[in-house]
Amino acid sequence: LSGEHIWCQGFSEPNAGSDLASLQTTAVRDGDEYVINGQKIWTTVAHLAHYMLLLCRTDPNAPKHKGLSYIIVPMKDEKGNPYPGVTVQPLLNMAGTHEFNQVFFENVRVPVKNLVGEENQGWYMAVRTLDIERSNIGSAVGQQQNVEDLIRFVQEARGSGQERVSLLPSLRYELAERWVETEISLLLSYRVVTMQNRGLIPNYEASATKLYSMELNQRIANTGMKVLGLYGQLARGQKWAPLRGRIEFMYLRSVANTIEGGTSEIQRNVIAGRGLGLPRD
């Protein structure tokens, strides 16, 4: 892998998030091409991407899960300019970084050969993509590093960190809990990686990893802010920001973790239904 091309996923729309199959972006067959119109939102790195895996509606008369197709859409032309008919607008997150975008398609033409799989069978391709995404979204190694850095801060800092832990013994317990939880997160990730190495596609196992890991991100950030005290509010790049402002950024950025790639509620539904065989509500 050369890493020369960046891809993004065109899934969510303003009125189709958790209910993804309600999406309205269309691809109409015109000879050897599809003509695409519609809008996607919360598209990660669309402003950098060379291609998009687009989930769109090719049969408006079919049941909503049955009339969808998976199409590769160029995001840039050969000169690196926006592909004709594609407009990308930034959406800054609360941490102040540009990761998300909204993407508009106006009579975008792509060849029929860009269809992935069979026409009107795109839902199954999208679900498979999400299973793979969720299996890789866990950040166990980074979580361990953050917790270990917080522990080291308490051990080495002269001032706020040690004082807060001595004044609030409950923080000692929180740090211990976070450390144990990062070990659990790592083991969940190992299970998913082992399945992938065996040629299996994780399903509810990926959802379990995503759910636990992303909610753990928020717990680590909350504990970190307690440990760092007022200095924890200092952002990256500021002189006195402890741990280079990582915890402040994590505190803000982790809010999106339990939304992107499927909300925590969606993950629990997947685990309950596909993993435990429980009936739907």
Predicted features along the sequence, with ranges:
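A short, Trp-centered hydrophobic/proline-enriched beta-strand micro-motif
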Residues: 3-12, 55
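A structural signal for short hydrophobic beta-strand segments in well-ordered beta-sheet cores
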Residues: 27-28
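A short core secondary-structure module
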Residues: 33, 37-87
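Glycine-rich phosphate/cofactor-binding loops in nucleotide/flavin-utilizing enzymes
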Residues: 120-132, 136-140, 228-281
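C-terminal helix-coil-helix/basic helical segment that borders enzyme active sites and/or dimer interfaces
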Residues: 155-172, 183-239
